[in-house]
């Protein structure tokens, strides 16, 4: 919806969309009827990322948005089964490494470091957060190697918390 509280012009989306600009000029509220989604601030799945699961978001601040700009979106495929990821202190999957299987509200408490410079997502989908307790900028990771922070769309290596995307979407 273009306006808060589900008012104004709206667009219903059922799959990935690389450019939403032709449907609306701003996005201030969203209803997610099913599944999990990543919203992107810019077209072609670029810019700030926002994770949404089923529910109502009457205001962009409810999804931790920095503005009313939503220009593309992707459905996160449901993935059942275990989650496993290796996080690294340095780029190119080097330096201190820690294998993780669970959500982490404080990377510093777990890893004794504020930065993750690379990671290898072995199983499941994950969300990195720039601040502790799942706050701040968000980055969606699917299975694969991320040899530097720019590979997951970040401008720096600051990752202060992360969580698994579970089947409950």
UniProtKB/Swiss-Prot annotation:
GO molecular-function terms, A-Z: structural constituent of eye lens
SUPFAM superfamilies: gamma-Crystallin-like
Pfam family, one: Crystall
Entry keyword annotation includes Coiled coil: no
Region (Connecting peptide): 78-82
UniProt keyword annotations, A-Z: Eye lens protein, Repeat
Domain Beta/gamma crystallin 'Greek key': 1-34, 35-77, 83-123, 124-166
PANTHER family (alphabetical): BETA/GAMMA CRYSTALLIN, GAMMA-CRYSTALLIN 2
Note from the entry: There are at least four genes coding for non-identical gamma crystallins in this multigene family.
The protein's role, per its UniProt record: Crystallins are the dominant structural components of the vertebrate eye lens.
Domain statement: Has a two-domain beta-structure, folded into four very similar Greek key motifs.
Record family assignment: Belongs to the beta/gamma-crystallin family.
Protein name per the record: Gamma-crystallin 2
Natural source organism: Rana temporaria (European common frog)
